[in-house]
């Protein structure tokens, strides 16, 4: 196995360095030739669908079809909503409208849409995406997110679910797609988690865990694997046994040198040993 895609976290407000994800995608489109890339995940609760559809189409065009757009609601605990004065109420309904608008803009000559939250009159974008259809990954585990994924997505991207929780969601999505006369490939179910070669007793890890729990309201063990290659591979296999086969591994570190070392360890000690892993639908 090898690195086949790069993913950028979406976070507008942060005291730590976080590059804006759509800008990073555009940069990767111009500086890489083969590798795919996506956002993990971009919050549609904070974005205008016309502008976002145009950005995605442009990036896919510039990269000759290598964009993997992924969207979610954004946490209602996120400082991005508070700082921007954006309400978290009805963000699921707004996202549903946005997804319909974006899908239509990517495939139709012009789009007229009159919804509760968005209205467009004969909107069109050119050039449209190179990929037809443009892959669309959606995150979330609520009943509404499952329905949203079944209706619009080509893949599902989990976040802080346990392997067994992920299995239940995968099954529900697969069942729901039938209702919409669609299907999602069995290998288009993924998840992501932070990775740290080290110990939970390290001060940077303690801070990382505290920040995560404050931001998400969930235990850090749900979002991170800390230890060695065996612990990371065990977590990957646990998800694979539950029907999840795509993994976004996020190295965590304190500074560029540490991040580089952690990334190299993932490639050398983890990815080199994953070729035998197989997901179980």
Q: Which residues does each predicted region cover?
A:
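Active-site-adjacent structural elements that line small-molecule/cofactor binding pockets in enzymes
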Residues: 1-281
């Amino acid at each position: 196995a090898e690195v086949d895609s790069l993913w950028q976290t979406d976070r507008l407000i942060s005291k730590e360095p976080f590059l804006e994800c759509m800008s990073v995608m555009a940069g990767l489109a111009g500086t890489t030739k083969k590798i795919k890339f996506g956002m993990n995940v971009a919050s549609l609760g904070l974005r205008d669908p016309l502008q976002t559809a145009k950005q995605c189409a442009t990036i896919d065009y510039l990269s000759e079809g290598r964009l993997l757009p992924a969207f979610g609601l954004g946490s209602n605990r996120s400082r991005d909503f508070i700082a921007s004065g954006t309400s978290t109420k009805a963000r699921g309904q707004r996202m549903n409208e946005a997804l319909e608008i974006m899908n239509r803009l990517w495939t139709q000559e012009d789009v007229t849409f009159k919804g509760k939250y968005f209205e467009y009159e004969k909107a069109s974008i050119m050039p449209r995406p190179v990929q037809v259809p443009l892959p669309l990954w959606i995150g979330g585990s609520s009943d509404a997110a499952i329905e949203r994924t079944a209706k619009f997505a080509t893949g599902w991207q989990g976040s802080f679910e346990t392997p067994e929780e992920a299995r239940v969601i995968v099954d529900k999505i697969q069942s729901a797609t039938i209702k919409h006369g669609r299907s999602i490939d069995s290998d288009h179910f993924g998840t992501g988690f932070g990775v740290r070669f080290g110990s939970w007793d390290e001060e940077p890890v303690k801070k990382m865990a505290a920040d995560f729990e404050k931001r998400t309201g969930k235990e850090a063990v749900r979002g991170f694997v800390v230890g060695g290659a065996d612990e990371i591979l065990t977590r990957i296999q646990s998800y694979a046994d539950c029907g999840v086969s795509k993994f976004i591994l996020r190295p965590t570190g304190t500074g560029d040198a540490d991040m580089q070392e952690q990334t190299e360890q993932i490639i050398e000690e983890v990815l080199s040993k994953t070729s035998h892993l197989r997901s179980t639908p």
